[in-house]
């Protein structure tokens, strides 16, 4: 038995992405759920793993997975074509820009996100003014931080990089 953190929804689904005869394990990056919007309003980027030497290893960024990542991004962009309001929803934009950065298309994507993200949506990154961990912080000590700064830090902390220069500048 292999221990893994719990996954939301239906867990893994399986595809042989690289054509080697072994099924890859696909899931979404649960860290995006509720981070910038409601669960339903969140676009969680695809994660791809393989069973190697008795453990599950993240292979999302391996070159053999690139076509599948492009396919996933195309699906999200098609959804936004059908529902143009998504281009003004923080949860969608956060996942979309993460996908674009992962594919090396972050500069133009960051500019689009910077022009479309909204402050004060009730979701998004916060700091605790009393210095406690967020989960232990009294509600009156929670203060929102600017959404773009929070998004840039979130992406960097969770391995979505390298960030575009404009986003990287916000993490200092």
Task: Identify the role of each PLM range.
Residues 1-3, 58:
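Feature marking well-ordered beta-strand scaffolds used for ligand recognition
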Residues 4-13, 68-69:
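Repeat-based blade/solenoid architectures
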Residues 10-14, 33-36:
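Short, well-ordered, mixed-charge alpha-helical segments that flank or form enzyme active sites
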Residues 11-15, 46-49:
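Hydrophobic/aromatic beta-strand elements that line small-molecule binding cavities or substrate pockets
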Residues 16-18, 39:
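A general structural signal for short secondary-structure junctions and capping/turn motifs
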Residues 18-30:
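Acidic/hydrophobic-patterned starts of short beta strands in beta-sheet-rich repeat architectures
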Residues 28-172:
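Acidic, small-residue rich beta-repeat scaffolds with periodic aromatic anchors
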């Amino acid at each position: 038995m292999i221990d893994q953190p719990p996954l939301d929804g239906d867990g893994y689904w399986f595809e042989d992405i690289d054509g080697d005869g072994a099924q890859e394990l696909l899931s979404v990056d649960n860290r995006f759920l509720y981070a910038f919007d409601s669960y339903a309003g969140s676009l969680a980027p695809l994660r791809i793993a393989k069973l190697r030497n008795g453990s599950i290893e993240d292979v999302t960024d391996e070159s053999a997975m690139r076509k599948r990542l492009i396919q996933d991004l195309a699906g999200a962009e098609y959804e936004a074509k059908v529902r143009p309001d998504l281009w003004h929803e923080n949860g969608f934009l956060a996942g979309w820009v993460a996908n674009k950065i992962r594919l090396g298309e972050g500069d133009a994507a960051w500019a689009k996100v910077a022009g479309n993200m909204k402050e004060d949506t009730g979701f998004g990154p916060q700091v605790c003014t009393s210095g406690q961990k967020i989960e232990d912080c009294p509600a009156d000590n929670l203060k929102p931080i600017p959404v773009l700064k929070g998004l840039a830090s979130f992406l960097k902390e969770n391995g979505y990089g390298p960030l575009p220069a404009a986003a990287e500048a916000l993490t200092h």
